[in-house]
A protein has these predicted regions:
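Glycine-rich anion-binding loops and their surrounding alpha/beta cores
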Residues: 1-197
Length: 197
């Protein structure tokens, strides 16, 4: 969250929420991470902003998966295809991913769009507690993208393996972590550690 890493962004948060549309802060947040991670998975809703974001990762020499659902959401979607720009070693490869090819059923957009933060948190906790359905599918798919980006940074030769195969591998890995209860336990530990008195 940019507001945590960049205190100046904190003041823009309430206004951004009131506006209710994407702003420059939606672009700056992922790009201004002071940790400068070597691997990133970043969703972009606005297709016109993709070249800018991909270009930043290229210039930094970072490894990244930048993606956009064809339904216009800034996530890998389960409502249809997603477009992915894979940045590694200064080069960009474009991919089209259909979640059905990964064994994920199609969802309706209304089944996966977010809600108020409290409801989103409830949905995530339900998925981590074992609930199946469209929320689980989209969470696992996007988790797989993050894991695939990390593995690509860790082992650059992964770029020679088709992205669909890498996503399928990481999807199984994400399923295992959720189904084992480990993800729920980590969330609870993190929540407890970050409670403010």
């Amino acid at each position: 969250n940019a507001a945590v890493h960049h205190p100046g962004f904190r003041h823009a948060g309430p206004t951004r929420r009131e506006i209710g549309v994407s702003t420059l802060f939606n672009v700056l947040g992922p790009l201004c991470n002071p940790a400068r991670p070597e691997a990133s998975a970043v969703g972009v809703a606005d297709l016109a902003r993709v070249p800018l974001i991909v270009g930043v990762f290229q210039t930094r020499g970072a490894t990244a998966l930048v993606y956009r659902g064809d339904d216009g959401i800034d996530k890998l979607t389960t409502t249809g295809h997603s477009h992915i720009w894979e940045v590694t070693a200064g080069a960009v490869q474009e991919h089209d991913i259909d979640p059905v090819e990964l064994g994920i059923p199609r969802a309706a957009i209304e089944d996966i769009v977010g809600d108020e933060p409290e409801r989103n948190a409830e949905a995530i906790r339900a998925v981590l507690a074992g609930e199946r359905g469209p929320h689980r599918d989209v969470i696992l798919l996007n988790t797989a993208a993050g894991l695939a980006a990390y593995e690509l940074w860790r082992r650059p030769e992964e770029r020679f393996v088709p992205l669909r195969e890498r996503l399928a591998t990481q999807l199984r890995r994400a399923e295992g972590v959720v189904d084992s209860g480990l993800a729920a336990a980590r969330l609870e530990a993190w929540a407890a550690a970050t409670q403010r008195s």
